[in-house]
């Protein structure tokens, strides 16, 4: 699935507006709309913010997998 469609589907599944997600990413509603509609690219910092906000993996959000794996906090820290 195209990541733009996935972003829109996840946002709508959470009953959130483009303006609300735009605010989360420090963008206007129009700025976020441009990401969902292909007029702007999703920046890696914004992807990380969305993954944490939705508690979903980047692989799922960008459409590399259809498995809605939640983020595993322990895997993001290196064991010493």
Segments and roles (model prediction):
Residues 6, 17, 43-46, 57:
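Residues that mark the N-terminal boundary/hinge immediately upstream of a DNA-recognition element
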Residues 12, 23, 52:
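Alpha-helical residues within the helix-turn-helix
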Residues 26, 45-60:
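DNA major-groove recognition helix of helix-turn-helix/homeodomain DNA-binding modules
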């Amino acid at each position: 699935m195209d990541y733009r469609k996935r972003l829109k589907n996840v946002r709508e599944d959470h009953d959130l507006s483009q303006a609300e997600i735009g605010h989360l990413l420090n963008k206007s509603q129009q700025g976020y709309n441009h990401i969902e509609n292909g007029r702007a690219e999703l920046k890696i910092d914004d992807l990380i913010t969305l993954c944490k906000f939705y508690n979903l993996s980047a692989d799922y959000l960008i459409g590399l997998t259809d498995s809605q794996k939640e983020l595993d906090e322990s895997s993001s820290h290196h064991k010493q």
